């Protein structure tokens, strides 16, 4: 193993991935070759002037000229780019065994047990390779268990790139995808109290009674869909939603919303599937999972997870109850060639260990509180900031042309992220149904100095734009 480790250069330099800098070719050359060989529909950040990564370390990325950038985008690299403990765990397992899951491995069971220790009420895990796979499998589980076909999703939802999950994703089928909304998918209003169907006034956004009432209205919308589906002699297998909506604009649902929806869905024989692919493993700070945010007793029937759990290594999973898992496929078993392989499981175990050893839940909570204070102060100064919403290290800044009308300002959002990159070395992304939400979802090692740097730069950019 030491020969492999030395050859890869993982532990021979104090700078992670230092070996990568020895083979950095011009961005122009790589982009030309990319255009010739990679599908034109493969998305890329900063498409007019793509960012080329030569190496990465913790919360920083380095371009082809070794310029350093603060990464506020990469929630996948959960505990930090090339975190040495994760790199070590992956490297050791890679040099030990990569045998698939039809052999018995301690890593598979250890990994499943550790995940389940954070999910009360669930007792079974099935492994996959991506969030898209996990969400596809979750729907199959729900259908096989309930014997129903239909699904309820929420506006602007994104659940993956495979055909089934694109059919579950208004984020795709409402925006020109060749995959259209099927008859069995029903779209409920997004529980967004700032832009949604049951929006609140600015002075009501922190009013608990108003938030509860809005949440009740949104859950009643789901109840209406369930009644309509049943009236047509159909059945809903599952309500499917992200715990906190990410691509849809960093939306935090009101307290008790999921709990009330669960009552309605289960009364109609369906299951609750919560997609934690973007928000799990401590990003929200207070809890390990975003659906646990409110401590309201809500327990999903199925939880899907992916992105952060491998810190960049491909791995995902579905957690559920044994009786649901046992219904999968009838007489046909479940096998996934790479899902749950020992290297992937080693990555997950090491990520969870780093989260614990480095107190990253507490750190994310503390950084989130400091970030909120800084962003609220920024909102008071800049009229273009219509709303600030988030928790832990999961935040959205809603940019508007006018606070009264809340008209989204896509042009400003795009100009802002370009200016932050060019002049300040800060990488942010804009998303949401109107592409006007600045998303802050960095690696969890993001610190107080990073917050100050980001907010100061954002303040200066908006000031220069007279906004």
Curated annotation (Swiss-Prot):
Name of the protein in its database record: Ethanolamine-phosphate phospho-lyase homolog 1
Similarity-based family: Belongs to the class-III pyridoxal-phosphate-dependent aminotransferase family.
SUPFAM superfamilies noted in UniProt: PLP-dependent transferases
Necessary cofactors: pyridoxal 5'-phosphate
Modified residue annotations for N6-(pyridoxal phosphate)lysine: 307
Organism: Caenorhabditis elegans
Keywords from the named record: Lyase, Pyridoxal phosphate
Entry EC number(s): 4.2.3.-
Gene: eppl-1
MF annotations from Gene Ontology: lyase activity; pyridoxal phosphate binding; transaminase activity
TM annotation in the entry: none
């Amino acid at each position: 193993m030491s020969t492999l480790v030395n050859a890869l250069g993982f532990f021979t330099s104090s700078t992670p991935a230092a070996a990568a800098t020895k083979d950095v070719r011009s961005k122009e050359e790589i982009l030309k070759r990319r255009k010739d060989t990679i599908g034109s529909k493969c998305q890329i950040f900063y498409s007019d002037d793509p960012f080329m990564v030569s190496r990465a370390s913790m919360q920083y990325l380095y371009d082809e000229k070794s310029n350093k950038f603060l990464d506020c985008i990469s929630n996948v690299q959960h505990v930090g780019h090339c975190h040495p403990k994760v790199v070590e765990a992956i490297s050791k397992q890679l040099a030990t065994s990569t045998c698939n899951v039809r052999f018995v491995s301690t890593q598979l069971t250890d990994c499943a047990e550790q995940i389940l220790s954070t999910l009360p009420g669930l007792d079974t895990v099935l492994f996959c390779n991506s969030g898209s796979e996990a969400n596809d499998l979750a729907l199959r589980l729900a259908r096989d268990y309930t014997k129903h076909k239909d699904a309820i999703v929420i506006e602007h939802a994104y659940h993956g790139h495979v055909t089934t999950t694109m059919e579950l994703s208004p984020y795709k089928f409402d925006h020109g995808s060749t995959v259209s909304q099927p008859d069995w998918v029903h779209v409920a209003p997004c529980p967004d109290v700032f832009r949604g169907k049951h929006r609140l006034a600015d002075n009501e956004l922190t009013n608990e009674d108003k938030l509860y009432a809005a949440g009740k209205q949104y859950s009643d919308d789901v109840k209406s869909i369930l009644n309509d589906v049943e009236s047509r002699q159909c059945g809903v297998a599952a309500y499917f939603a992200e715990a906190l909506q990410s691509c849809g604009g960093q939306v935090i649902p009101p307290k008790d919303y999921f709990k009330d929806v669960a009552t309605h869905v289960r009364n109609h024989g369906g299951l609750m599937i919560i997609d934690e692919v973007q928000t799990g493993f401590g990003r929200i700070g207070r809890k390990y999972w975003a659906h646990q945010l409110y401590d309201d007793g809500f327990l999903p029937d199925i939880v899907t997870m992916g992105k952060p759990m491998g810190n960049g290594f491909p791995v995902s999973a579905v957690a559920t109850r044994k009786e649901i898992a046992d219904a999968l496929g009838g007489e046909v078993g479940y096998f996934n060639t790479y899902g749950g392989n020992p290297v992937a499981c080693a990555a997950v175990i090491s990520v969870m260990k780093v989260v614990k050893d480095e107190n990253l839940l507490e750190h994310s909570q503390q950084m989130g509180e400091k970030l909120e204070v800084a962003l609220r102060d920024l909102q008071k100064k800049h009229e273009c900031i219509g709303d600030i919403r988030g928790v832990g290290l999961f935040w959205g800044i809603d940019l508007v042309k006018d606070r009264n009308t809340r008209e989204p300002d896509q042009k400003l959002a795009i100009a802002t992220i370009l200016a932050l990159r060019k002049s300040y070395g800060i990488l942010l992304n804009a998303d949401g149904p109107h592409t006007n939400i600045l998303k802050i979802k960095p690696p969890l090692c993001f610190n107080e100095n990073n917050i100050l740097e980001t907010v100061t730069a954002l303040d200066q950019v908006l000031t220069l734009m007279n906004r």
